Amino acid sequence: MPPLSPSAPPPGEPQLTARQAERRRRILRAATALAVRGGYEAVQMREVAESAQVALGTLYRYFPSKVHLLVAVMLEQLQGLHEHIRRHPPTDREPAPRVADTLTRAFHALQREPLLAEAMVRALSFADRSVGAEVDRVSAATGQLILDAIGQCGPPTESQRAAVRVIEHTWHSALVSWLSGRSSIAEVRADLHTAARLLTLP
């Protein structure tokens, strides 16, 4: 399944015009730049609106809260990473090492901008039911990243789907643990490799 465009609205909402899509991209770029510089607290909706050159009311029509906005930023980051890995896929013949390699590369991409990673993960942690559709899209993008790394033809088996869910949870937990200083980079890598080995189970 190809990833959705970062400018695409959530499923069930009307398609954006070209002008609306460009406005949404500007908003996401502005939020990303603020998060890179100062993390979650630096992303203030008024500053995002000013940087994106949109009215504050317009910003809230696109993203009802900062949490909605930063979850959308995370989706955009995952989609960009997905495209990069599709162009440069892992080369191992077995699925478990391919998945471990993919998630390790994803972790390193987030590691390069720790304040942005902190902002996105905090937004996911704060998300309530009103952000459910956006969180589901992030989860689907993460799951698709893992499924693509498995690299098989045809739909995944039920055991593979179960393994992907556990691997996805491990990935998120490892990222939170690293951001909070409870896990080292080496421990994150080890956890990702351990979780990926679930794919070898019958």
Q: What is each PLM-predicted segment?
A:
Residues I27-A35, Q77, A106, W171:
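Short hydrophobic clusters on alpha-helical segments that form packing/core surfaces
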Residues Q44, A117-V121, G132, E158, ...:
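Short, hydrophobic secondary-structure boundary micro-motifs
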Residues R26, L34-H68, A72:
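Helix-turn-helix
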Residues M1-E22:
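N-terminal intrinsically disordered/low-complexity leader segments
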Residues A72, E83-R112, V164-I167, R189:
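Hydrophobic alpha-helical connector segments
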Residues Q79-H82, D128-G154, E158-H172, A190-L198:
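Amphipathic alpha-helical packing segments from all-alpha helical-bundle domains
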Residues A109-S130, L147, S173-V176:
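Amphipathic alpha-helical segments used for helix-helix packing
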Residues L70-Q77, E134:
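Alpha-helical DNA-contacting segments of helix-turn-helix folds
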